[in-house]
Amino acid sequence: MRTLHPAYRVTDLATSLAFYGAIGFEQVGRVDLGDGVTLTMLKFPADEVVTLELVHRPADGPVVIGSGFSHLAVQVDDLGGMIEAVTKAGLSAGQVERPGGLDGPQTSWLRDPDGYRIELVQWPPGHAYGITAADFSGTGDHLARERGTRGNTKRR
């Protein structure tokens, strides 16, 4: 089995498409389900498959995020360049953090138009794509705390 993609409900499809386009997503396809309901499939240029679905149901009203969803993490090759690009697009990214110390990843956070949190992650050179079991084997790793809660969490 494999994870396919998350689906975010969005309030304003055009605004959301502009936001996700600014961080590098491209539209793969769109399905019109009638009554203004659309499913828009996005991916990054290097991805082979859809990695994010935007669900627009205008009759449902504005999106309310709630407390069940934390964030979407996006791997970037050049965090500084990405922050510069999103700033030029009128978006606001948080300052660069190094949650795992100097040997860990660099991260920055931003929010999409509906309030979904996006974590931008630049891994150190030589790190595998994404989080692996090796990230849990050392001390002081970057996964020890969940951003947004300000509290520390322990791994099991």
Task: Pin down the residues of each PLM region.
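Conserved beta-strand in the GNAT
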Residues: 52-53, 119
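Generic beta-structure capping elements
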Residues: 45, 55-57, 123
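Vicinal oxygen chelate
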Residues: 2-12, 30, 40-43, 61-156, ...
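Active-site/binding-pocket entry motifs
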Residues: 48, 60-61, 126
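Short glycine/serine/proline-enriched coil/turn segments at secondary-structure junctions
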Residues: 34-35, 62-64, 102
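Arg/Lys-rich, alpha-helical DNA-contact motif
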Residues: 47-52, 64
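Core segments of cupin and vicinal oxygen chelate
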Residues: 8-49
